[in-house]
């Protein structure tokens, strides 16, 4: 039985065949609560990743994990796959930004793991469910933390002669205590394809207080 919240195939493109159940969760698409005081959002599983940021950005907040498919992927699917993105370097993947879930277990029991605070008491069943690809239960509600948007974001594009040099540079930056908000590496072929298509690319962003940005 596959019960991913998005009722879709995963990144490996496996498809349901015989003796399985495919659950369409598309109508679970509402944001239930935005709690700015506790900096969290309670949402149904088929709200898209990017929709969470859109819902809170007017108040100066955002949801950090950003898979490349964030415009379409569901938050329930993110939990099922423990999704991450460019900004996972600093802010972690879904598991680092997930506070709680409501889930229907295989025997029909409806239960909650976690809540509105990190490190809820008891066993880490929330961690067990995260990344389980929908095999342990059906997620019906998700609570995630939101972060205050940085005052200023600056981007840098840096060229290196080799992939090794690029990796060493990132390691040295982090070793000096400066963790980029996001970082991507592109080889020669990908850089050429990007430039041919868009004439521009973004590799590095770093959020900082306004008075610390050059």
Where are these regions (language model features)?
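Single conserved hydrophobic/aromatic residue that forms the stacking wall/gate
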Residues: 1-8, 12, 204-214
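Glycine-rich N-terminal segment of FAD-binding domains in flavoprotein oxidoreductases
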Residues: 6-28
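Residue-level "edge-of-site" marker
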Residues: 9, 68-69, 186, 211
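Short secondary-structure capping/turn micro-motifs that flank functional sites
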Residues: 10, 72-73, 189-190
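Short Asp/Glu-rich motifs
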Residues: 13, 75-76, 192-193
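Short, hinge-like loop/turn segments at secondary-structure boundaries
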Residues: 18-22, 82-83, 200-201
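FAD-binding subdomain of flavoenzyme oxidoreductases
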Residues: 29-184
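Terminal amphipathic helices with adjacent charged low-complexity linkers/tails
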Residues: 186, 190-206
């Amino acid at each position: 039985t596959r019960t991913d919240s998005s009722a879709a195939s995963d990144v490996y493109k496996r498809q349901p065949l015989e003796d399985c159940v495919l659950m369409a969760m598309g109508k679970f698409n509402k944001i239930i609560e935005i709690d700015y005081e506790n900096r969290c959002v309670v949402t149904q599983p088929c709200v898209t990743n990017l929709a969470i940021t859109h819902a809170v950005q007017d108040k100066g907040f955002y949801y950090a994990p950003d898979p490349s498919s964030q415009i379409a992927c569901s938050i329930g699917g993110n939990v099922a796959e423990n999704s991450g993105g460019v900004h996972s370097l600093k802010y972690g993947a879904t598991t680092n930004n997930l506070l709680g879930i409501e889930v229907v277990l295989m025997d029909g029991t409806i239960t909650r793991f976690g809540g509105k605070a990190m490190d809820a008491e008891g066993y880490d069943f929330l961690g067990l469910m995260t990344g389980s690809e929908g095999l342990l239960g059906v997620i019906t509600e998700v609570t995630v933390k939101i972060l205050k948007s940085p005052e200023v974001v600056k981007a840098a594009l840096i060229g290196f002669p080799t992939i090794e040099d690029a990796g060493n540079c990132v390691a040295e930056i982090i070793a000096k205590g400066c963790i980029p908000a996001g970082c991507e590496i592109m080889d020669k072929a990908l850089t050429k394809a990007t430039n041919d298509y868009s004439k521009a690319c973004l590799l590095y962003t770093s959020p900082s207080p306004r008075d610390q940005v050059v």
